[in-house]
Amino acid sequence: FYHNRLDVAQAWYQKLDAFVGEVSQRVENWGGKYNYLIMSDHGFTTYQQKIHLNRWLAENGYLTLNNGSTEGDLSSIDWQKTKAYAVGLNSIYLNVAGREGKGIVGANEIEPLLAEIQQKLMGWNGPDGKSVMQRIRLKHEVYNGAYTRLGPDLVIGYAPGYRASSETGLGKVPQNLIEANHDHWGADHCVDSDVVPGVIFANRDLQNFGGVSFRDIPFLAIGKHLGQSHIKPPSHV
């Protein structure tokens, strides 16, 4: 993850490419027909700026610390005066009454408050004059199923060059808003998903899987129609 060691990434790509070739050759030597898929769930990118998201929430009036403190962590937050908080690298939660232990945001406030925070964050520019955010989505726009309710109220998609700080991930509230990243950890995938798409390689025709996702893996890998490339993916899994 070192900023100045891109040669390491290239070397590993070469090793992995050789490994894939070796596996493919061994399977081919077994004889008969075979299929293989190589997928990743995300890509990778560098980031130069660390975002302290709870500091932004504090400066914009959504989060208040106890006793006039200028920095702290989750235990330092005055929950009776806090409407939103960040914990995790890409998450904002509202302090919802009846859900959080000391929630104050009523049901009728949730939708307009989320829209307000979303709009303000999308208008936030960093030191380079560019937007800090690439995209911000509501939980139901990202997740589906029985556990959607457990997801963050806003899913934060940082723009290229920006990423949440480790302090944000732990729910801390530092004094700074944005900090230059001089850490050895200089790259990962914790930005907007469109910035770091995954990849798929296959030795079969995937023309009917234009928007292929991980939900298609069982259908592609273990079904009785494995060799029938004309079969379309299921509409719902």
Identify the residue ranges that each predicted region occupies:
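Non-catalytic, well-ordered alpha-helical segments in soluble enzyme domains
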Residues: 96-127, 204-206, 210-236
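Secreted, luminal/periplasmic, and some membrane-associated catalytic domains
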Residues: 22, 27-171
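A short small-residue
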Residues: 1-3, 97-98
